[in-house]
Amino acid sequence: FCLPDGEQMLGYPVAGSGNDTRPGKRRYNFVWYRPASEDKELISLLTDDDGHYYPTGIPPLKVSWKHIAHMRQVAREILAPQYAEILEKTAAPFLQAIYDVRSEQIVFDRVALMGDAAFVGRPHVGMGVTKAGDEAMVIAKYIAQLGATPQALQAYSDERLKLGQQVVARAQYLGRYMQAQGSKGTRDTDNL
């Protein structure tokens, strides 16, 4: 971890090509959480050098060279030298906007929302894939018990709605805490 004021950087080894985990063959994944205003900074970050704006996410190789140069400059100024070096050596860094989605309802008639369609929390809790898999198992359980009925979908909602909301709240809390925002010694017992 590296925690510059109001930001967060983390990194960890992952398997390399062919799922290789031998020393020297692994890759290194890193994430730098940086706040950006939605009205100006984010729009600029999601606009390529040809002026094309990608509102839902810019393709990795389309990130403007100006933003990459600026990122590397800021990294040298505020990050630990090891992380600044990683950013210097990354040939094609990419960026992704992070949004929170907290649904108030996940069942609509004969439609049930699951996974990221129902809730999207900041990556700090690491629940995206796990939550989607759990939701698939829960809805399968209720369909097996009650058939493909509105009652099965309601049972699914009863079990998963509050949990999904709690996951998003916890991710928001951890994100604020890790970025040293809103964590001035207060204890948020609802989201611990």
Which positions does each model-derived feature cover?
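Short acidic alpha-helical/loop segments enriched in Asp/Glu that coordinate divalent cations
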Residues: L42-T47, Q82-P93
